[in-house]
Amino acid sequence: YRVHLTGPLRQAPPPLAGGSGVEVEEKPAPPPLGLERAFGWDRWDQAYLEALAKTGNEPIGSLGYDGPLAALNPEKPNLSEFFKETVAVVTNPAIDREREVEHFSTRTLLGRRPLPDGRGGGRVEELLLPIVLEEDQALAEAFGTLTLSEVRARFKTKTLVPQFTVEEGLLAGLKRLEEEAVKAVEEGAEVLILSDREAFQGGVWIDVGLAVAAVNRALMKRDAEGVALRRRTSLLVHSGGVRNLHDVAFLLGLGAEAVAPWLMEEKARALEGRKGLAGVLEALKKGLEKVISTMGIHE
């Protein structure tokens, strides 16, 4: 049947100047493939990150690992691949991250750690997630963390580059990095940023795991009052070599207070835009809670 309409037809609104009126997020270009290879990324890391960005969860895979052990890998593996998680479930029944999540906290503190008597205190910021972003302050605030620029604005920071020259060699480069860290803290640095953004410009990259371990050990040096320099500062790892949850947990276990995985952030934005980065943060938060749940918690 026919329906006769009366009255003027509603006209479509005129298009907005410069576009269709529908705001579409422009995704940045992916980082160069050579940069990914230099930091040890492979196809598995790419597929893993895609799952995080699209679903906000870690991918589900089969049990077991059928790849070569790190010591037998013909390619140069990152240091974290030589380490595996030790599961120590001592509760019966096993504690459940999904239903007993209130037992787990991913909070961390940036800044000086005061002594029990109050001496040596300074500015301290609590992060609900030990992941610092390069940009997007609103997204960082939504996850209870900070951007790198906010860290630099709120604290006295010192940036150290984990690299060595061919002439000096790895051991001498590590020794120099340790000395630079000690000097920076003695001069008042509240946050040490180990950044490999410029690591391949005129030098050879030092694996950030090795750099964190060396700096953390060097800062155990005590001052005139007998207090370790480590209490005066926090370690923030700004690295392109952070590829997955295991890398994040590995660096935190070595002594870092927070991690800024800049290459992972760039790749997530290139894949799914801002939504993809939010998915990565959510997945890493869940993953860290899962790691904590297997460390051995008992009443």
Q: Language-model segments: what does each one mean?
A:
Residues Y1-L177, V182-E186, I193:
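Extended, highly charged accessory segments
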Residues Y1-R2, A214-H298:
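Phosphate/diphosphate-binding loops
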Residues L72, R197, V204, V237-G241, ...:
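Glycine- and other small-residue-rich loops at beta-strand/loop junctions that grip anionic moieties
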Residues V90, S105-P116, V166-G169, A199-V204, ...:
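Flexible loop/turn segments at secondary-structure boundaries
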Residues K175-E180, A199-G203, L236:
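Active-site-adjacent structural elements in folded domains
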Residues E187-G188, L254:
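Structural motif
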Residues L192-I193, V259:
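Hydrophobic residues within beta-strands of alpha/beta enzymes
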Residues L194-L210:
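Glycine-rich, proline-tolerant flexible connector loops at the mouths of alpha/beta enzymes
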